[in-house]
Amino acid sequence: MSLLNRLFGIYEPPKAVELPPICDPVFGDLTWDSQYRWWQGHFTSPSGEEFEITVDAPSDTETHPTEDQKKVFQAVVPRLAELKMLSVRDYLPYFNADGVEGEPYTEAELSVEVVPDDIHIASDLDVTVSWVETPNELLGGHALTARVSPDGEANIGLEG
């Protein structure tokens, strides 16, 4: 950043950094997205569900996933089925009240209708897991989400 830009507070976005793909022992094969400054790949859960995975660059100077990011991810993986159930259970009363004609959905029926979308590991160590609807568009283009803080607390919501 030039001296004049610094004096007048003019922000220049960091230059795009291109990085070669990596094979991380925890996250698997990842490719770098310089636009979003994150690593992206695919993850298969213990139950066989396929998620996209994105891992934020920890800082402007450090780009590779940190040990702490790996630890919070590894702590969330065994909870994926529980988090999906909590997300469905939280949303079901609103869904049945507003979005269903005829018989209301059961928890099991709605659970089948939502499919894995993304697991995002943020630089602040929050992990957000999201599920989207099947082609039936039951969620109206939204996603059920579970945001898990580094201490393991889960906040459930609907986004999009």
Stretches with model-predicted labels:
Residues M1-T31, A108-G160:
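Acidic, proline/glycine-rich low-complexity IDRs
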Residues L7, C23, W32, S47, ...:
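A general marker of short, structured functional hotspots
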Residues L19, D24, L30-T31, Q35, ...:
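Alpha-helical protein-protein interaction elements
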Residues V26-V76:
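Contiguous hydrophobic, core-forming segments of folded domains
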Residues D33, W39-Q40, L92-N96, T106, ...:
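Short linear interaction motif-like sites in intrinsically disordered regions of transcription factors
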Residues G41, K84-V88, V129:
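Short, hydrophobic/proline-enriched secondary-structure or compact coil segments at domain edges
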Residues T54-V115:
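Long, charged/polar, surface-exposed segments that mediate recognition or autoinhibition
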